[in-house]
Amino acid sequence: MQLNVKLNAPKQSAEATALQSAADRVKSATETIDEAWQRIFAMKLTDAQRLTVLEAKKAMDSGKVGRIKTGKFSKEEALEIGRRVVAEKNERERKRRMEETVATKPDNYFVITKDSDLPRLVDRLMLEVEAQKSDAWFRKAFDLFNNTHIRKRLLQEGVEIPLVTSFTEWDTETSGTDTYIDLSGGYSFWLPLLNEGYYVAYGHLTDDEQCTRSNALEIVKSFIEDAQHIKAFHNTPFDLSMFLNDGMRPRGFRYDSMDAAQIMNEHEDSFGLKPLVTKYKKPIGASHLDDFTFEDLFGNGSPMIYSPEIVGIYAIKDVEKGWLYTKWQIDMMLKSDKLAVAYFEIRQYLYEVNTTIERTGFVIDTEELARLEIEFSEKLGAAIKALHDAYNIDDQFLYEMSLALKGDKIRDWITSQKKRIEKQAEMLSQCEEELKRSNPTTKKYEQLQERIRKYKTNKLAEPVPQNAPDYIHEINFDSDQHLQYLIYDVLKIEDKSKIIDKKKERLTNKDVLALYFKSEPSLKPLSDYSKLSTLLGTFVRKIPNALDKDGRLHTKLDTVSTGRYSSKGYLGKSNDVLFAEINDDNYLEAMRILVDAEKKTRKGTNLQNIPARTDEGTRVRMAFKPPINHTFIGSDLSSIEPRIQAHRMATEFNDDIFAEMYRKGLDPYVEFAAILFEIEREICTESYYKAMRGTPDEVPAYRKAMKQMFLAIGYGQAFDMFYKGVIPFGISEEQALVAYKKFDEILPGFKGMVEATFEHLRKYGWTATIFGQKRRFPGYVEKYKRLCQLMKRCGIESKNDPELGKKTNKLHRKDRSEFWDLMRFTGGCERAAFNHTIQGSGANILQLCMIRVYYQCVLGLGWEFALTLHDELKCAVPNGQLTGDAPRLFDSIMTDTYHLVLPLACDTVIEPCWMDEYSPSEWFAKQNENGGI
């Protein structure tokens, strides 16, 4: 047994301290390099740092490198040596790989660097096209592209998507990844039947021979712009954007192996081409190809700074890999349930559609935003004052908040500060005593005088809370900690965080705040502040600086797990790097600037987060304008999700009651509310609820409660959870129980639909939309089986057993904890699984509408496709085409593109700017009064 005893050593004088420091320096100077390495390896190092230091030690031990600094050998120096060693090692390895790549170049790889070789390239391309026409596999693939519902529907409208006659794999090498500004410097393609690949170089920043850009692009322009020739890529939207940046009008960009990979398995570890090809190398027939990634050969740099030969070989290998993977994907999708249907009926068209929407963007009235900034800033100042007044935010408030949030740190600081003050006084006294004994003519005397002066002039702060570094001198309404104190500790708001996240408490995120703002009058001042602060900080001030090269505001579209669209901002290169015009004379200069430019400028915005239900949010949206001589026309699908529920009930479970209400033009939520809550139909309407609200005759929000019931049953919720959800609507527990018990009797097909969805999930671990688009839930099947074992052990009949909580007490503590973890996991999967079958199907139908808008309105009529958001589509129509036919066409697109067993409905409006809405009848009546647009 070893005792570590520390004795209180006497305090040292300044001279003793100096002597000790000198001794330490001598000791460090005599430290051997082995001792230094031992010291550094004993320090706190991440795994990556430890490997880097190890590389440094190996290199120094072998004599390959030496120290790069003088003085004591430090961790920082070791890391820097290691980084240099690793960088040099990687560079040597890259050069070796490059040499190997060039030395093993296949005979069927052709790198084109002469303009005179371009015609032969096109001849080979056309020969491939001819060969594919008589190939059985390609005829099968062409049928997948051609034989689709939307193509047939467009033919009924007189719009023809050209029949597919070829299918080849392509890729581009570029100056960067900005999809609006960067340019291509080379393109590659693979000819499957001829079994050969080509790379055309024209933008390399080396002294090597290469093609002229204009000739290289012109030679394939007609092929790139011909929709009958399908061009496949891995990340098609990116390469489509590059060809657009190069001045082309690409068509037939209808296969993306990256997107198809997500259709096949959205849980791949990586969706990069190299990891996927490496994973499926044997089944796709790519065993003869190496696994070098872009980084393996070129590091993090641009391919344009390397020779056309090495980049060309790499690029051709990419398209060969891409083709082998693409062909295998199609074969697999045809074998796997309805995956080919999900892909070819919808997804193949979306790359051109989505890219068109993103690149269209909005014209922004920046002058209006400037006016709003002034107005909203004044309102924000008033809102901040109102906050301080309403919540008595003064010095006493800040004092109490500081002690509540930072009390321990503040008290520790006070204790330490008192010691520091005592120490300073002691040092001052020592210096003054030593000064008395010193010779006034010595340097030491001057030094003591200077130290005394500093001690007297630089007095330490008084040890009171207000001087502590952690003291809060100003409340920050954007701080979670400050808001938690205000909401939960000062205002004593009941914590409803678990409604949003069952694992969390005292949340202050936007979802929880939205819940409180609706039900807590005391939070109105905070609500007013939050609304204005968000509008100003996120939109009004940022949007004018987030415009792209065309002066418009764009957004990046993303699809959530169900397939619905969301939008977000993105990083791009500065618009300052743009050339007014690109030609053969200035192209390489432009490429050099683009290659060197960083992609760090924030552009675009999240459109769906601009509030639509407040006056201020509406005014921000109204700054989004159509182009000159255009007017917006927009439409959204009405109640698409309950209509899909009704469709499934009728077609899968022979229950027509829901669908029949839509066929009769009734509001099912009102009708079912009247039946289930046993109340008069009129009282259940939203208009009656709003008319009576705030009066002695106020009634519960029966229609909203009915919508909540459909959600609750769809998510498999027990009564207690359903009741919690309808309490805010004024529904009594007795009313809720009556309605809940009657639901299955009135709508037996709905429960059957939910149970069938859950049973499918429990058997296969996935669910799908009505078009076969899957969503998989890894681990669900195994965890549900384990949950069933635990339920059986304690006599629980089902997850909705009313005595579930009580019965789990029969389990041991560890098993009980596991039980509730499994309940949460499986419950989340079940809700998402059912939601996918409904919301995902709605997203698929909207996508079909988008495809029709693209082909019929954008390509056919010259409209601009500005937006897809939730269930809404918006186009800018040339004013000359804004007749009664325009809204009728949009109505047809939304309701007559795909048919359910009940009618679809939409709400079409005409807008001179976003949110300034007129029904078609109102608009044309107004135009007649005013004599035109």
Locations of regions flagged by a protein language model:
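Acidic beta-strand-to-loop metal/phosphate-binding motif
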Residues: 169, 228-236, 632-634
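Nucleic-acid-processing active sites and adjacent nucleic-acid-binding tracks
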Residues: 193-231, 362
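Conserved "right-hand" nucleotidyltransferase catalytic core of DNA-directed polymerases
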Residues: 2-204, 268, 280, 288, ...
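Short active-site loop/helix that positions an aromatic residue
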Residues: 177-178, 237-248, 260-264, 483-492, ...
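Conserved catalytic core of nucleic-acid polymerases
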Residues: 352-355, 359, 429, 560, ...
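Helix N-cap motif at beta-to-alpha junctions
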Residues: 878-884
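Short beta-strand
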Residues: 476-477, 864-869
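Metal-dependent phosphoesterase core characteristic of DEDDh/y 3'-5' exonuclease domains
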Residues: 190-194, 236-301, 328
